[in-house]
Structures are given as structure tokens and as C-alpha cells.
């Protein structure tokens, strides 16, 4: 099963996924956490097809892969293709948890390829629980509290 956390604000999606990852580790579930940028960098660190395929296989074997901040910045078509390959390898085999700040309908712009983004979304949401997180930004809440207390920075 996959889990997708969606919202365009800072409401604690990352903290929630980290907590789920910690609980998975306590259950002896092999878990890895990456930001989307870190994951894409890992997949594109080399031009060697052999190393890329080895990395894809290693990542696909992880029982719970947590990917934070999908689509916070645009990626190239080649990077999108590699991410698609990873999601295809994991599809119906291992679990993935993602966070994103944009709707699925906007992913095509970030992935530079609407067809690939649709295929990735299809694999992620099939057998998935999708949660739209609502609420006030934790960071803005803290800022408002500090402001109301007249805390001054020196």
C-alpha cells in the first residue's frame, strides 16, 4: 500500500512521514527517507547505465520508500523517466509514502512530461491512501506567537 500526503501549505506532512518511517523501522521494515531532490540526484549522479540500473534495483527493494517534497521544483524529462522506472519497479511490490505541495493535475509541468507524470501518478495512487492535509502552517503559527509576545531579534 502507498500513502500520499497532499497540501500546498506547511502543515507537518514531513513530520508525519518521518513518524511513520520510525514506526516502520520499529517493526523491522526496511525504510529509507529521501527528499525528491536527493532521490533524483542519487539516480542521476552518473551517466553509467549499469550504475543507474543497480541504483534503481537497490531502491526498488526497499520495503518502505519515503519521498518528501515531490514536485517542489521541476525536473528534466530524463530525470522524470528515471523516477518512472523506479515507481514501475516498486509498483505492487513495495510501499511508498510521498508528500507533495501541488495537486496531481499539476505534476505534468514539474515532470516536463504529462504522459510520464500520469503514469507515475497511476502507479502511486493505485492501492493507495491519499490524504489532503488541512490546517494552519506550523511555522506561521510559531511566527504569530512570537509576534504576539513582542519577541525581538537582536
Q: Model segments located where?
A:
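Walker B motif beta-strand of ABC-family P-loop ATPases
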Residues: 64
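Post-Walker A helix-loop "phosphate-sensing" segment adjacent to the P-loop in P-loop NTPases
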Residues: 21-34
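Walker A/P-loop nucleotide-binding motif
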Residues: 1-16
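Aromatic/hydrophobic pocket-lining residues that form π-stacking "cages" and hydrophobic walls in ligand
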Residues: 17-20, 86
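Short gly/pro-enriched beta-turn/loop segments at secondary-structure junctions
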Residues: 15, 26, 59-60
